């Protein structure tokens, strides 16, 4: 999606703004999904560190992001399935590590790993989400993967005046 292109008389493309964007960059490291009100790290752990991680290392990675207060936040975590699946969009072809096509918005930089660890505790098999196929898979917790940390934005309260008596 993004911007549509219209043709004018001289066949020069003219960009037409479609209005507010769903994904908004909030500084150099953070993206806000305005549809779900979830903040995401722009880069996954593979892009950030250049190495794969098992599930336990993915949890440690999110803990380190909290210690460093990336984006000014200290509540980064592994995403839940219902959160991560909202990033999948077949209309986007974003080249991932090794040239694998990932179906995520181009606001996320190219080169991410195709699977990301998810929150979940099911014995020794842990959930991952595959951005090339749009599905959740369960694998051994010591398998290779990456993580794209997230956090939920707090609900904004509308300021109201106290009632007069």
Q: What spans do the regions from the language model cover?
A:
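Extracellular adhesion/carbohydrate-recognition regions
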Residues: 1-71, 75-76, 146, 150, ...
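Generic detector of ordered secondary-structure context
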Residues: 29-32, 109, 141
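Short, flexible loop/turn elements at secondary-structure junctions
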Residues: 44, 82, 121, 151-153
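Residue-level marker of intrinsically disordered, low-complexity segments enriched
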Residues: 3-6, 12-14, 22, 99-105, ...
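Disulfide-stabilized extracellular recognition modules
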Residues: 126-164
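An exposed tryptophan-centered "aromatic clamp" motif
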Residues: 54, 59-75, 81-133
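Surface-exposed, flexible loop/turn segments at secondary-structure boundaries
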Residues: 48, 84, 155
